[in-house]
Amino acid sequence: MKLMVIGGGGREHAIIKKLKENPAVEKIYCLPGNGGIAADAVCVSEIGAKDIPAQVEFAKAHGIDYAVVAPDDPLALGAVDALSEAGIPCFGPDKKAAVIEASKAFAKDLMQKYNIPTAKYRVFTDAPSACAYIDAEGAPIVVKADGLALGKGVVVAQTVEEAKAAVRAMIEDKTFGQSGARVVIEEYMEGPEVSVLSFTDGETLVPMVSSMDHKRALDGDKGPNTGGMGAVAPNPYYTKEIAAECMENIFLPTIRAMRAEGRPFRGCLYFGLMLTKSGPKVVEYNCRFGDPETQAVLPLLKSDLLTVMQATTNGTLADASVEFSTDSACCVVLASEGYPQKYESGFPITMSEEAAAHCYVAGAKKDSDTLLTAGGRVLGVTAVAPTLRAAVEDAYHLAEGVDFANKYCRGDIGRAALAAREERG
């Protein structure tokens, strides 16, 4: 089988490494890929993740049997629709279903209509009305750009002034372009956060092992928000009881709601949850695998990924075997110092054989035989072990085996999870 994966980050590298485990897979193309993914797939760097017509032409010309569309942008732009129309079976939601991530206002309205627990909210298109609402509600309060903003369109404002400044930046200064033309303002929720990725064919939903993301740039959850500095799986806060509650009150109601709206969701539906004192609530939906959660979750998948993906496409997920290991995983992201703000790149990357076997490359390019840094998040290393403590220790050992000039990583990935595990005995 010939496969095509759209995207070029650490998440795509993790997906490709897992797909390669199937002996029927003879070739994987990655569009555009990156210098590190090139070790595991044929990278077609001249075709970007959003260049849908070129992707379709490439798939037809190269006899692609199955495609995986991983990032949010091409999904929102209708990559799955275009490939499916060209006769290429695909993993991922169509454009109508991808709106669950592409518009936060749509997602919030859906939850309100179908009684899916989430934070109280209002949607605004003009700054004065939004600012008046903030004055009335007070702080802390959350301001979100309605559209896609690379995971950076959310401001958790501690003061009224900070919230109003965020609104003005989004609506008036167009910090996120059209994505911030509408803003969602919602109540601040407190509690542990949990990420749950799931496979769904629109009827059946199978949750993957839970995970904990680390979004802030600095230790102790300080500093600006990033795309994610590391992840552990499973999440110790996510007990069997909470999982059952989420399945009944959030997961199944969501896919039923999407069906009822004429937008059946097939692919990976990501639930960003907060475990509040009044129960689990939805923080956000993503219409695809999370990054770096995927790099912690997929190494724990015991079943064949390609078979499970095809079952979501074919509507046969109810008959598929989806099994996860009871081990723990920890992914530590190595970034360029200064990320997510200003950073330098173009530095040579060296890594031990052991680290190379467990790494997922995100921001790197090849210059002849040398791998060079080419992004904020450069790569992630993942360790799997029988205990979370061992997985965390092993992941940091792997991180020591990678070197580049301005290497930076958080030193506390998994610390909160370990504390929670000890607290719960």
Label each PLM-derived region with a short phrase:
Residues 1-95:
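ATP-binding N-terminal substructure of ATP-dependent carboxylate-amine bond-forming enzymes
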Residues 4-5, 101-182, 212, 236-252:
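Active-site nucleotide/adenylate-binding loops and adjacent lid/helix of ATP-dependent enzymes
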Residues 21, 36-38, 91, 113-115, ...:
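Solvent-exposed alpha-helices and their adjacent loops that cap or buttress functional pockets
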Residues 68, 79-118, 122:
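Glycine/small-residue-rich loop that forms an oxyanion/phosphate-binding "nest" at active or ligand-binding sites
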Residues 157-294:
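Internal nucleotide-binding/catalytic subdomain
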Residues 247-269, 286-356:
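Active-site "cap" helix and flanking loop/linker of ATP-utilizing ligase/carboxylase catalytic domains
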Residues 311-425:
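Peripheral (often C-terminal) accessory segments that flank ATP-dependent C-N-forming ligase machineries
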